[in-house]
């Protein structure tokens, strides 16, 4: 998500999104961190209701403030594509600890879908770190996987967490069936 450096292979598995898609259904989203949504008929705003059971890997609850922090961090310190893609978002606000509202400058249905796919970062972890700088520290995530081990430029191993908060959600049935996944790097990118 940051501008400098290349993200580690498998790092996209470290963070859950507000909602998740199905690999066999086009444009269908299912609740994950957000257990419910509400949106205007003209597609100019959307409210995500955060599942009160949603937790980061340190056991702290995922809140609307984390979503606001994530969006603002991506817009100010993330890759330039975020600014371009989300330029139609007028503002984002936490209505309470479990409701977050995105208001758009104009109607844009596909942007509502994209916002639902937003990975959520833990504010309490990232607010004291420089998000724009590459790191070799294992980040705190929200998904069912964390980095188990790595060797820079050679491999990354992610491991499944047994106490993942969303392991029993219907959307996760049949997913996350491997205890470990290893990503190897090769000097030749064509390999």
Tell me the role of every PLM-derived stretch.
Residues 1-9, 33, 60, 82, ...:
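A structural "hinge/loop" feature
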Residues 83-126, 146-151:
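Surface-exposed binding/hinge segments that line
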Residues 1-41, 72, 140:
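N-terminal lobe/hinge region of extracytoplasmic solute-binding protein
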Residues 43, 87, 97, 140, ...:
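Short helix-initiation/N-cap motifs at beta->coil->alpha
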Residues 22-24, 116-175, 180-182, 190:
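Gly/Pro-rich hinge or "lid" segments in bacterial periplasmic/extracellular proteins
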Residues 1, 35, 45-48, 67-70, ...:
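Short, well-ordered beta-strand elements
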Residues 35-80, 95, 101:
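Aromatic- and charge-enriched surface segment that lines or borders ligand/interaction sites
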Residues 19-23, 42, 55, 67, ...:
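Sec-exported extracytoplasmic/periplasmic mature domains
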């Amino acid at each position: 998500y940051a501008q400098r450096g290349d993200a580690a292979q498998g790092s996209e598995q470290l963070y859950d999104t507000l909602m998740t898609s199905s690999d066999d259904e086009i444009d269908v989203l299912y609740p994950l961190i957000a257990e419910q949504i509400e949106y205007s008929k003209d597609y100019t705003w959307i409210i995500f209701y955060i599942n009160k059971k949603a937790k980061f890997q340190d056991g702290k609850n995922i809140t609307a403030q984390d979503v606001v922090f994530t969006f603002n961090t991506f817009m100010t310190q993330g890759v330039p594509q975020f600014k371009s893609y989300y330029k139609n978002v007028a503002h984002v606000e936490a209505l309470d600890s479990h409701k977050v509202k995105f208001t758009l400058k104009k109607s844009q249905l596909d942007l509502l879908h994209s916002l639902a796919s937003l990975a959520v970062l833990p504010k309490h972890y990232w607010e004291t770190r420089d998000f724009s700088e590459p790191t070799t520290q294992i980040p705190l995530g929200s998904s069912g996987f964390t980095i188990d081990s790595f060797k820079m430029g050679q491999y990354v191993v992610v491991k499944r967490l047994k106490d993942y908060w969303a392991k029993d959600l219907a959307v996760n049935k049949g997913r996350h069936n491997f205890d470990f996944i290893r990503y190897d790097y090769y000097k030749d990118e064509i390999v």
